[in-house]
């Protein structure tokens, strides 16, 4: 598995999906090189709205649902099936009461990621935006991870 560091976590890539804090890494690369391995064209387009949530901000399941025209519960289902956690930042989606909600890597990892990105005031998210569709996926991906 090829791995890269993003703030407090290691992200692993097995050729089809990413893993947060994988147990074994055969090779470590820089984050920019890691991103070049991923074919974003194969990703569910509804997940690309995640790239419209800037670093340091969060959105809620409800706001995300409004943009997609679906329910917050469906958004939770969609986030749970994100094949690229951290890369497509589903950790930036929180509950309407600003509690963190769930995360593939666990709530503590979600909290560490949000703190690393400057999205927390104390223990709670403090800057909320409505997700938006982006034009240039690659550019948004690099900006989302602080590489541009």
From Swiss-Prot:
Active-site residues from the entry: 90 (nucleophile)
EC number(s) on file: 2.1.1.63
This protein's record includes keyword Transport: no
Protein origin, superkingdom: Archaea
UniProt keyword annotations, A-Z: Cytoplasm, DNA damage, DNA repair, Methyltransferase, Transferase
Compartments where found: Cytoplasm
InterPro entries (UniProt xref): MethylDNA_cys_MeTrfase_AS, MethylDNA_cys_MeTrfase_DNA-bd, MethylDNA_cys_MeTrfase_DNAb, WH-like_DNA-bd_sf
Cellular-component GO terms for this entry: cytoplasm
Location, primary (coarse class): cytoplasm
Molecular function in Gene Ontology: methylated-DNA-[protein]-cysteine S-methyltransferase activity
Catalysed reaction, written as an equation: a 6-O-methyl-2'-deoxyguanosine in DNA + L-cysteinyl-[protein] = S-methyl-L-cysteinyl-[protein] + a 2'-deoxyguanosine in DNA; a 4-O-methyl-thymidine in DNA + L-cysteinyl-[protein] = a thymidine in DNA + S-methyl-L-cysteinyl-[protein]
GO BP, sorted A to Z: DNA repair; methylation
Family note: Belongs to the MGMT family.
Function: Involved in the cellular defense against the biological effects of O6-methylguanine (O6-MeG) and O4-methylthymine (O4-MeT) in DNA. Repairs the methylated nucleobase in DNA by stoichiometrically transferring the methyl group to a cysteine residue in the enzyme. This is a suicide reaction: the enzyme is irreversibly inactivated.
Other facts noted in the record for this chain: This enzyme catalyzes only one turnover and therefore is not strictly catalytic. According to one definition, an enzyme is a biocatalyst that acts repeatedly and over many reaction cycles.
NCBIfam families to which the protein is assigned, alphabetical: ogt (TIGR00589)
Protein name: Methylated-DNA--protein-cysteine methyltransferase
Organism: Pyrobaculum aerophilum (strain ATCC 51768 / DSM 7523 / JCM 9630 / CIP 104966 / NBRC 100827 / IM2)
């Amino acid at each position: 598995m090829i791995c890269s560091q993003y703030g407090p976590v290691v992200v692993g890539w097995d050729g089809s999906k990413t893993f947060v804090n994988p147990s074994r890494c055969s090779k470590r690369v820089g984050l920019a090189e890691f991103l070049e391995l991923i074919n974003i064209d194969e990703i569910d387009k509804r997940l690309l709205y995640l790239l419209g949530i800037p670093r340091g901000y969060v959105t809620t399941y409800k706001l995300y649902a409004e943009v997609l025209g679906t329910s917050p519960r469906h958004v939770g289902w969609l986030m749970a099936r994100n094949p690229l956690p951290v890369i497509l930042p589903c950790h930036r989606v929180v509950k309407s009461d600003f509690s963190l909600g769930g995360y593939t890597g666990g709530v503590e990892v979600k909290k560490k990621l949000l703190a690393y990105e400057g999205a927390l005031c104390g223990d709670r998210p403090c800057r909320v935006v409505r997700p938006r569709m982006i034009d240039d996926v690659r550019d948004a991906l690099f900006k989302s991870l602080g590489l541009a």
